Amino acid sequence: MIRALATTNSLLPVDDRHRKAFAPIGTPDRLLLGPGPSNAHPTVLKALSRTPIGHLDPLYVELMGEVQELLRYAWQTDNRLTLPMSGTGSAAMEATLANTVEPGDTVLVAVKGYFGLRLADMAGRYRAEVKTIEKPWGEWFSLDELEAALIEHKPAILAMVHAETSTGVCQPMDGIGDLCRKHDCLLLLDTVTSLGGVPLYIDEWKVDLAYSCSQKGLSCPPGLGPFTMGPRAEAKMSARQGKVPNWYLDVSLLNQYWGSDRVYHHTAPVNMNFGMREALRLLAEEGLDQAWARHRSNAELLWSGLESLGLSMHVPAVSYTHLTLPTRAVV
């Protein structure tokens, strides 16, 4: 029997066609001035390079709680379901929809740039009845425009982008959450480019679902997608007729790992969470008011310099330009 197994499992010749002799990686140090990824603090980079520990190690479990609490601070929320998705911001975007959209739900997407279109595409893939209200790229929505669309379409969810990466527009949020409560729908907010960079108040604005990324305003390399879900969205998820149609992003399962039970779901990207913890710690150490002011000061300096080169704002009003992404057009 042993001899037969040895014969059956005998080694085949190794195909060496793809065995290439590459040099060790040697990326240069660059100052990153695009919309993301952004430069990471040396403390964050050092944390990423630490020796991994197990994803159920008591030390890691403690760190998970610290990351959650610091995310609540950054978002200004008390939401219990606040955690970093294992994936980039697009994974967190999909998580907000996968957990709350049921087939036939009307999802109204306020589109004012590329990432509003992505929200609409994703919602449709979860068999939502997608409706859109659109503004020319570089403009933002008024409360009257949004309320008219809510009255017309009667959605289960209004989804919109806070700071639209593709245009630089930062949507004014005062009153939108109240409109959603008035018309009995959830408010889903993309904060990918705004978290850590501009004033952002999830609870005060009555936002029910939000997501972000690690590599922009938080100054951590890409790899995690912060996610937060409020009580109204949690209630909708709990009332689903069937399972969340995405096992990996199912918050009801993830909460068993990130919540008090600490039940294994998947192998978490341990070192990415090391980096996220340090990036969030540095943000809390600086303070949100100071961080927002720093971004504002740097943005105004950049705007002034670009104007001196003969460039003009793509967004017509400076007050609605996203501070960490000043988009310009040549005149």
Indicate residue ranges for each PLM-predicted region:
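Conserved small/polar residues in nucleotide/adenosyl-binding loops
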Residues: 321-327
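Active-site C-terminal subdomain of aminotransferase-like
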Residues: 39-40, 215-304
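Active-site phosphate-binding strand-loop segment of PLP-dependent enzymes
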Residues: 140-196, 209, 217
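Conserved beta-loop-alpha segment that forms the PLP phosphate-binding cup at the N-terminus of a helix
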Residues: 80-108, 112, 116-120
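Conserved active-site segment immediately N-terminal to the catalytic lysine
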Residues: 203-215
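A glycine-/small-polar-enriched, mobile loop at the entrance of the PLP active site in fold-type I
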Residues: 29-85, 90
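N-terminal glycine-rich, Lys/His-bearing helix-loop that initiates the first secondary-structure elements
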Residues: 1-51
